[in-house]
């Protein structure tokens, strides 16, 4: 079966901007009543709007692509929902729900497609700032439906070097245990003048927006654990189209699946210097203090 990825990208862009985005923008900051997904010692928030938007997306893609599978954050069932080789939409109706609840204008919808478990279409839309970032395999990246001159941006950023980089991090919703301790210890090493000595950290509160910003050349890398496939699927495709790489958060995890749960995403380099990326990744891993592991 031949799949027209460019057409799917166009369809998802229209879905994001015309149907999903207006809901996110109009309802931001209005959801004072919300649920915690995993108990009182977590801050993993879900609102009624998350569920409403996912239902809208599901109905739209099922109408247009009835044979494709669908995985959404709010309909995911642990131990039952699996990614297969079949064409599968993997979506996060509202990525950055905490931002959404607090009316901080960095929530978005993240719409991805995998084929043979590989992210091949990605669409990320932040309606608050009207930013649409999209890509499909072999077709490059677009920003607000226009081809993006990422090479010029990379030239202005210079070489990819750990101690000259700005790194995106997120502590996550779980604030105890070994994973949390590993994150805190790693943050300290990345900042320390004796180890990573990075220029600084940024936390955008949205994995999808973070990966979009890496693809556009505004951040150098993103290290996180605890994410799910719907957090990174769209951004993964977009980043790869501009020469970026996604590996595991733990040292030695050079090849991972989209549902790995731990990730290190790195921007592209001038002239696609893979050795430069490899050194950056290795230097970054040398700052990882512990091991991230999620069920």
UniProtKB/Swiss-Prot annotation:
Mg(2+) 1 binds at residues 73, 92, 94. Inhibited by Li(+) and Na(+). Mg(2+) 2 binds at residues 92, 95, 231. It comes from the Eukaryota. Coiled coil: none annotated. GO terms for biological process: inositol biosynthetic process; inositol metabolic process; inositol phosphate catabolic process; phosphatidylinositol phosphate biosynthetic process; signal transduction. Pfam families: Inositol_P (PF00459). GO terms for cellular component: cytoplasm; nucleus. Pathway: Polyol metabolism; myo-inositol biosynthesis; myo-inositol from D-glucose 6-phosphate: step 2/2. Substrate binds at residues 73, 94-97, 231. Its cofactor is Mg(2+). The keyword Repeat does not apply. Its main location: cytoplasm. The keyword Magnesium applies. It catalyses: a myo-inositol phosphate + H2O = myo-inositol + phosphate. Transmembrane segments: none annotated. It is found in: Cytoplasm; Nucleus. Keywords: Cytoplasm, Hydrolase, Lithium, Magnesium, Metal-binding, Nucleus. Gene3D superfamilies: 3.40.190.80, Fructose-1,6-Bisphosphatase, subunit A, domain 1. GO terms for molecular function: inositol monophosphate 1-phosphatase activity; metal ion binding. Belongs to the inositol monophosphatase superfamily. Present with 2440 molecules/cell in log phase SD medium. Responsible for the provision of inositol required for synthesis of phosphatidylinositol and polyphosphoinositides. PANTHER family: INOSITOL MONOPHOSPHATASE (PTHR20854), INOSITOL-1-MONOPHOSPHATASE-RELATED (PTHR20854:SF4). This is Inositol monophosphatase 1. It comes from Saccharomyces cerevisiae (strain ATCC 204508 / S288c) (Baker's yeast). The lineage of its organism: Eukaryota, Fungi, Dikarya, Ascomycota, Saccharomycotina. The gene is INM1.
């Amino acid at each position: 079966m031949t799949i027209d990825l460019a057409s799917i990208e166009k369809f998802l862009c229209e879905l994001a901007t015309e149907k999903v985005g207006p809901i996110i923008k109009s309802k931001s900051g209005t959801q004072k009543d919300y649920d915690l997904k995993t108990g009182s010692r977590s801050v993993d928030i879900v609102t009624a709007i998350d569920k409403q938007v996912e239902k809208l997306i599901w109905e739209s893609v099922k109408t247009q692509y009835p044979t494709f599978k669908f995985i959404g954050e709010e309909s995911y069932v642990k131990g039952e929902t699996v990614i297969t080789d079949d064409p599968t939409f993997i979506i996060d109706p509202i990525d950055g729900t905490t931002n959404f609840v607090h009316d901080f204008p960095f929530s978005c919808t993240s719409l991805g497609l995998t084929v043979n478990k590989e992210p091949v279409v990605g669409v990320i839309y932040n309606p608050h700032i009207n930013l649409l970032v999209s890509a499909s395999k072999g077709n490059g990246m677009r920003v607000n439906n226009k081809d993006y001159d990422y090479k010029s941006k990379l030239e202005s950023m210079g070489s990819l070097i750990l101690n000259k980089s700005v790194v995106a991090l997120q502590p996550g919703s779980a604030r105890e245990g070994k994973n949390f301790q590993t994150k805190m210890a790693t943050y300290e090493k990345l900042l320390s003048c004796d180890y990573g000595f990075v220029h600084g950290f940024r936390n955008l509160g949205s994995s999808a927006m973070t990966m979009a910003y890496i693809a556009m050349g505004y951040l150098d890398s993103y290290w996180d654990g605890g994410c799910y496939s719907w957090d990174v699927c769209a951004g993964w495709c977009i980043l790869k189209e501009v020469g970026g790489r996604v590996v595991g958060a733990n040292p030695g995890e050079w090849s991972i699946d989209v549902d790995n749960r731990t990730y290190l995403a790195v921007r592209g380099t001038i002239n696609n210097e893979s050795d430069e990326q490899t050194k950056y990744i290795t230097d970054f891993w040398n700052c990882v203090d512990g091991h991230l592991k999620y069920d």
